Amino acid sequence: MVGIVIVSHSRKAAEGIFELAAQMAGEGHKMVAAGGMDDGSIGTDAIRILQGIQEANDGDGVVILADLGSGVMSSEAAIDLLEEDIEVVIADAPILEGAVGAAVQASVGGNLAEVVAGAEQAWNLSQRE
């Protein structure tokens, strides 16, 4: 199963997004919330993200969803730190809607490209239609 790492500057935001996406995905998901700093402050930590990638990895790849630009930079740093051969993609998607789309695709057995597409299709959602 493709793993998912949710990267937010806020631990609470990452955990809330995780909770919602996990509810949509159902049992057996491989998602990790990697938000905030160890001291509870706002920020992103490449080591925490690296650990999230390793935890979420099941051999089928990992998709990262990040909230802001420096979350993407920390995610890129985490990927650079990987010693294992894990295929990791940072999805270009809004973090909440993208996490839900990715989680649903992963839960039905989607491959890495399908899970990334599930996340990135969130740009096409309209709340008014």
Labelled PLM ranges:
Residues 1-129:
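N-terminal loops that bind phosphate or other acidic moieties
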